[in-house]
Regions:
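Short Pro-Gly-centered flexible turn/kink motifs
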Residues: 8, 136-152
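Active-site/ligand-binding surface loops and adjacent short beta/alpha elements
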Residues: 17-19, 26-100
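Beta-strand-rich interaction surfaces with strong enrichment in secreted/lumenal proteins
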Residues: 71-72, 132-137
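Short, solvent-exposed loop/turn segments enriched in Ser/Thr/Gly
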Residues: 4-6, 76-78, 143
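Acidic, contiguous internal or C-terminal segments within carbohydrate-active enzymes
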Residues: 1-20, 24-25
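Glycine-rich active-site loops that engage anionic ligands at enzyme catalytic sites
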Residues: 86-125
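Hydrophobic residues positioned within well-ordered beta-strands of beta-sheet architectures
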Residues: 6, 22, 82, 93, ...
């Protein structure tokens, strides 16, 4: 397969603590949801980041609720790598990451079923406004977020 590695460094050049969270949003071609099988190990898995999080099932799936425009799975305690195989187009996708900086994962798909997002995150959307759900860097500190994707 072919592998691409990406890295983001967040540096606090200011004079007070910098709250932030990071999440990448890669899109991968997919034939349709029914053809995709995920291989993901996570502690929890739900459709919302709010409230108590249910334990992740042994097999994580991404299905569309009737009448919904998208499908989402928010996962905590995600282990590297996350993988999926698409029996419709023959693609195999692996997302590898450093578990010490990426603790969450997201699966997302919207509208036409021509793609799937399989995303390493360390927080949730708007987490800087929720205590305990983001990272803070002190002045002069920096943190690197590195991940890779391999496609066969």
């Amino acid at each position: 397969g072919s592998t691409a590695t990406l890295a983001l460094t967040v540096a606090n050049t200011g004079d007070k603590a910098l709250p932030f969270s990071v999440g990448f949003h890669p899109y991968f071609a997919a034939s349709k949801l029914d053809n995709v099988a995920f291989d993901i190990d996570a502690a929890t898995c739900s459709e919302s980041a709010k409230g108590e999080q249910p334990a992740a099932p042994e097999t994580i799936t991404l299905t569309r609720k009737e009448g919904s425009a998208d499908s989402i799975r928010l996962m905590t305690g995600v282990k590297s790598p996350m993988r999926f195989t698409d029996s419709g187009n023959g693609h195999k996708v692996t997302v590898s990451f450093d578990e010490s900086v990426f603790t969450n994962g997201v699966l997302w798909q919207q509208d036409a079923e021509s793609f799937i997002c399989m995303e390493p995150w360390n927080g949730w959307a708007n987490s800087v406004n929720e205590a305990g759900h983001h990272i803070e860097l002190n002045p002069g500190e920096s943190k690197e977020f590195k991940w890779s994707v391999t496609i066969w």
